[in-house]
């Protein structure tokens, strides 16, 4: 029996990784997993609380461990946290264990999609959300592109249409 393939979605917060990932999983009859939700399940606390208690460094260590475990599964669609690509270990595991899709999204769309979401610790600062998102994009975009097998823009169509575009590009 052939091994089931994995699809890993990377990109900034507000790119639609979870929404698009669910559509892909439904259509391909795969399991959908969100790495942030898995961290919350394992810790029994929300991401903001983990950030408050352990800082970003502690959170990233948990994220690295969780993504390491999840990428060992077969037949999943995984929505990763926006900063997960900062870890070389995570990038290596994503590349080695599945097809990586970078969901590229302009800053304006990210701001619009995240402005009322209080569950994003990196945006809960004195710094303007747009400035935070621009800084994060500068740091992370080269890493998203490095790890991606292909790039899909998410700003001009519905999540369902984007999911279909991704499925068309997959060699399943």
Swiss-Prot record:
Keywords: Amino-acid biosynthesis, Aromatic amino acid biosynthesis, ATP-binding, Cytoplasm, Kinase, Magnesium, Metal-binding, Nucleotide-binding, Transferase. It holds the Pfam family SKI. GO terms for molecular function: ATP binding; magnesium ion binding; shikimate kinase activity. Its main location: cytoplasm. Binds 1 Mg(2+) ion per subunit. It is an enzyme of class 2 (transferase). It is found in: Cytoplasm. The keyword ATP-binding applies. It catalyses: shikimate + ATP = 3-phosphoshikimate + ADP + H(+). One of its GO terms (cellular component) is cytosol. Its EC number is 2.7.1.71. Its cofactor is Mg(2+). Pathway: Metabolic intermediate biosynthesis; chorismate biosynthesis; chorismate from D-erythrose 4-phosphate and phosphoenolpyruvate: step 5/7. Mg(2+) binds at residue 18. One of its GO terms (biological process) is aromatic amino acid family biosynthetic process. PROSITE patterns: SHIKIMATE_KINASE. It comes from the Bacteria. Substrate binds at residues 36, 60, 82, 140. Catalyzes the specific phosphorylation of the 3-hydroxyl group of shikimic acid using ATP as a cosubstrate. Monomer. Belongs to the shikimate kinase family. NCBIfam families: PRK05057.1. This is Shikimate kinase. The gene is aroK.
């Amino acid at each position: 029996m052939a091994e089931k393939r994995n699809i890993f979605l990377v990109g900034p917060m507000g790119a639609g990784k979870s929404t698009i990932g669910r559509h892909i999983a439904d259509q391909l009859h795969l399991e959908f997993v969100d790495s942030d939700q898995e961290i919350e399940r394992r810790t029994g606390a929300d991401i903001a609380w983990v950030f408050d208690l352990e800082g970003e460094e502690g959170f990233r260590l948990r994220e690295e461990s969780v993504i390491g475990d999840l990428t060992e599964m077969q037949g999943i669609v995984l929505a990763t946290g926006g900063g997960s690509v900062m870890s070389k270990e995570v990038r290596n595991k994503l590349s080695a264990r599945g097809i990586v899709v970078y969901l590229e999204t302009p800053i304006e769309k990210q701001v619009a999609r995240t402005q009322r979401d209080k569950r994003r610790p990196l945006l809960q600062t004195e710094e303007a959300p747009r400035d935070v998102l621009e800084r994060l994009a500068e740091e992370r975009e080269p890493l998203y592109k490095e790890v991606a097998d292909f790039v899909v823009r998410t700003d001009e169509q519905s999540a369902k249409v984007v999911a279909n575009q991704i499925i068309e590009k997959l060699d399943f």
